[in-house]
């Protein structure tokens, strides 16, 4: 998703592509959707596209009774209190990945 956004694709395109992947994965078993992470510096307003995709994914997940791991909010909140969670514009650093792992574990333990 994020790579498509960085290449200038809009939220509708990214969402439809991700839904195709979700539907394919669901034929193999339980699916959990991990929301896209923020784009750290909001390059050219691209973080807005990430947020739009995530809102669409949340609605899809709710309609299809699929669990969601909200990686976006996890990293956004850490970033807002001054934690350095990115190793560049898009990829989390060690702390960011650790926070994401904790969030995933929180969701997995409630299955």
Question: Which residue ranges define each predicted feature?
Answer:
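Catalytic His-Asp segment of secreted/periplasmic serine-dependent ester chemistry enzymes
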Residues: 38-111
């Amino acid at each position: 998703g994020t790579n498509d956004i960085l290449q200038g694709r809009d939220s509708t395109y990214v969402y439809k592509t991700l839904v195709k992947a979700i539907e394919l994965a669901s034929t193999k078993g339980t699916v959990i959707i991990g929301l896209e992470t923020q784009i750290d510096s909001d390059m050219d307003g691209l973080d807005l596209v990430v947020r739009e995709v995530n809102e669409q994914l949340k609605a899809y997940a709710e309609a299809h009774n699929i669990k969601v791991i909200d990686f976006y909010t996890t990293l956004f909140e850490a970033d807002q209190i001054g934690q350095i969670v990115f190793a560049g514009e898009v990829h989390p650093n060690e702390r960011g990945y650790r926070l994401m792992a904790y969030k995933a574990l929180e969701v997995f333990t409630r299955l």
